[in-house]
Curated annotation (Swiss-Prot):
Required for maturation of urease via the functional incorporation of the urease nickel metallocenter. This is Urease accessory protein UreD. It is found in: Cytoplasm. GO terms for cellular component: cytoplasm. The keyword Metal-binding does not apply. One of its GO terms (molecular function) is nickel cation binding. UreD, UreF and UreG form a complex that acts as a GTP-hydrolysis-dependent molecular chaperone, activating the urease apoprotein by helping to assemble the nickel containing metallocenter of UreC. The UreE protein probably delivers the nickel. InterPro entries: UreD. The keyword Chaperone applies. It comes from the Bacteria. Keywords: Chaperone, Cytoplasm, Nickel insertion. The gene is ureD. It comes from Paracoccus denitrificans (strain Pd 1222). Belongs to the UreD family.
Length: 279
């Protein structure tokens, strides 16, 4: 027997099913003696592994497993004066295909006077059709500094995925004592993807990363950083505007990109790499 399409006033009035959206927020405040406040809700979690030496580590996790259309993540870190910490993510963040509203990530990083923060997340992997808007706001008090990393991979390279549709807006703003001292923005859409092979765009690269060191001594590390920009399969450049060291990396694949990032981090910071990176 053939199935029949149900119709009539009762069935015609059924509204389209609305997909459930993921929401997550995690906030950590640290002082010289350790945790002062921790709050988390929804899919966002913040963990602080027990440390025997070095700076405290904050590890963020999105338990939803990735970001789809309309999802939102909010991460916040506040460091008291003279407090140092490292923050990272437990795994790569994934942005899936989105049919309507983009997923959103908001990061607010606040560092007190004389403090220091290393923000070293693992890669963001953008699937074909992903739509993602990310904003990172950093507020530094006088005498504070930070190291910011942002690695991005276009597509699941191991599966041979080609990115044909994408909407990405990614912006980082650093203010010190209320004055903007660093602004970095990236935007990619379908039109930009069609020109990716142009030398002025990404060439054939499918993985990229930016690092920004904000500190009075940043320029002193320019030549040491350039000395290790020789990882096979990676193209890199470094510059040192006043009070900053900026590095850009392009690679055909995520693995050589990660190897180059690790080599740079060993030059730019005295402490060991995040333990979660070694898992």
């Amino acid at each position: 027997m053939r199935g029949r399409r149900l119709s009539g006033p009762m069935f015609d009035a059924i509204a389209p099913i609305r997909m459930q959206r993921s929401r997550g927020a995690a906030s950590v405040r640290l002082g010289p003696r350790g945790i002062e406040d921790l709050a988390q809700s929804g899919s966002a979690k913040a963990m602080l592994p027990r440390m025997t030496a070095g700076r405290p580590e904050i590890v963020f996790l999105n338990t939803a497993g990735g970001l789809a259309s309309g999802d939102r993540l909010d991460y916040r870190i506040e460091l008291a004066p003279r407090t140092q910490a490292l923050a990272t993510t437990q795994t790569a963040e994934r942005a899936y295909r989105a049919k309507d509203a983009p997923a959103q990530i908001r990061l607010h990083l606040q560092v007190g006077e004389g403090g220091w923060l290393d923000w070293l997340p693992q890669e963001t992997i953008l699937y074909d059709g992903a739509r993602l808007g990310r904003e990172t706001a950093v507020d530094l008090a006088p005498g504070a500094g930070c190291l910011l990393l942002e690695p991005i991979i276009l597509g699941r390279l191991a599966m041979g995925e080609t990115i044909r549709h994408l909407q990405l807006t990614d912006r980082r703003i650093v203010r010190q004592d209320g004055r903007m001292i660093h602004h970095d923005a990236l935007a990619l859409d379908d039109a930009a993807l069609s020109r990716l092979h142009h030398p002025a765009m990404l060439g054939k690269a499918r993985a990229m990363a930016s690092l920004a060191l904000i500190a009075p001594h940043a320029a002193d590390l320019l030549e040491p950083a350039r000395a290790v920009l020789d990882e096979p399969g990676v193209t890199g450049a470094a510059s040192a505007p006043p009070g900053r060291l900026i590095l850009r990396l392009l690679a055909d694949d995520g693995w050589p990109l990660r190897r180059q990032v690790i080599r740079l981090l060993r030059v730019l910071r005295p402490d060991p790499l995040p333990r979660i990176w070694q898992v």
